[in-house]
Amino acid sequence: MAGPLFTANRAIVSAQGARLQLTAAHLAQEGIEHVRAMRDNEYLAKYEAALTDNAIVASTAGWEAFVALVSPCSVSEVCTLDPFLPMGVAANDSASLKICSLPCTTRLYLESGIYRGTGTESTKTSFTRTIEVEPVSETEEHVVSTVSWSFHGVTHSVVISDYLMPWQ
């Protein structure tokens, strides 16, 4: 009798672990996509402000604005993400990327089915998410999104990275 119950228990634990890993992968990818959207918004803002068809000028200006914007999310200080706040970087909860000194242990909250950077104690999850933007060259940034969580006393993490370059 104990054998089937043990097997059923292990199957449930495995399913829970898989669900958490899938959620973490989606949260990590959301971090990458948010930084990419920030780059795109800077380009579009510079393009519209220039009132010109010169896409190269807008691309350069947009890239420089993007690099300056995300520079606080570097190796020594990463950022956390709350995608429901206005797009930007700040040291407080006024922008989507919040500067967080290492080790950054800011938890995500699940409110109404949405993962956020703020919430109540009853909605705190075991997930943490950090965004790091490392300059590779003048025209390339390496974006790393890391989501970590604890399950049955073991810490797990999903790391997704991408390289962003200026619009051409």
Regions found by a protein language model. Give the residues of each.
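Low-complexity, Gly/Pro-rich coil/beta segments used as flexible assembly/activation regions
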Residues: 26-168
